[in-house]
Amino acid sequence: MSSSSASKLLGSVLVFAMISVQIVFIHCVMSLNETNSLNQTNVYLHHICINSQGTYKPGSPYEENLNRVIRAISITISNYGFVHGSNGDAPNTVFGKLQCRGDSYLSKCRSCLTTAFSELRGRCPKNKGRIIWYDNCLLEISPINSLGKIDYEYNFYMYNEKDVNGDTNLFNKNTRALLYRLKEKATSKENNNGKQDLPEIGGKRLGMKMLYATGEKSLRTMKLYGMVQCTKDLSIKDCIVCLNWIIAKLPTCCSNKQGGRVLSTSCNFRYELYRFVKT
């Protein structure tokens, strides 16, 4: 598993990697360009080749089904920024899930899908199961249907290399408060009212709920910016569970740091002392 591309694009330095049968957790140091953070597109973060889900051969039924799923997802991308599709019969069934960041719709979302799938072909050329994260999207491909399920297995975190100045305990407290406030906003009835689940590729397209929120908090002479998001196949109840679980990782990942994020295939959060997303 390599994070060399993340180092080149994000100015990141890989600190350590811990891999077990059940958990994949990557810890990176980030040094983002604050000035261009709102304009960055398709910035690679991390990928996982899931060896336990087997491999396939070029020209096989699995590859044919994979290509059909990706084409269908690309065609079906809408303003909601989420598509889940499947194609084929076992043992060659392929499931694909694309979740774009809440402010990355249509052209940005489709561009991120194209980049992500191309990169996965090179990084995990034979793996049936593979995941890749970009700043603007997540793409998961698997022979296993994970629709509507919280993924506790595949997650990683990154943090800004700069420590905060002053009262670190107060800063950490304010960061937690902002993220939990955004969790409430992302899962509120007001934020999701009327966003009905509609049929997907092949019969069920889910995820017309928002399950996404951004915000800011004034800290005397500076502002703290935050974002939380769940994939739209989760129910509101499961989104709450997922965000509670992932925000609880804050002390482990990012204590005293000026910025940080934790990402899984089901939910994620990020906070910074500069504006990285439209709020």
From Swiss-Prot:
Protein name (record): Putative cysteine-rich repeat secretory protein 22
Cellular localization per UniProt: Secreted
Cleaved signal peptide residues: 1-31
A Pfam family of this chain: Stress-antifung
Residue ranges occupied by any Gnk2-homologous domain in the UniProt entry: 44-146, 152-276
Keyword terms, alphabetized: Repeat, Secreted, Signal
GO CC terms in record: extracellular region
Gene: CRRSP22
Higher taxonomy: Eukaryota, Viridiplantae, Streptophyta, Embryophyta, Tracheophyta
Entry similarity comment: Belongs to the cysteine-rich repeat secretory protein family.
Matches recorded under InterPro entries: CRR_secretory_protein, GNK2, GNK2_sf
CDD domains per UniProt: Gnk2-like
Disulfide bonds: none
PROSITE patterns: GNK2
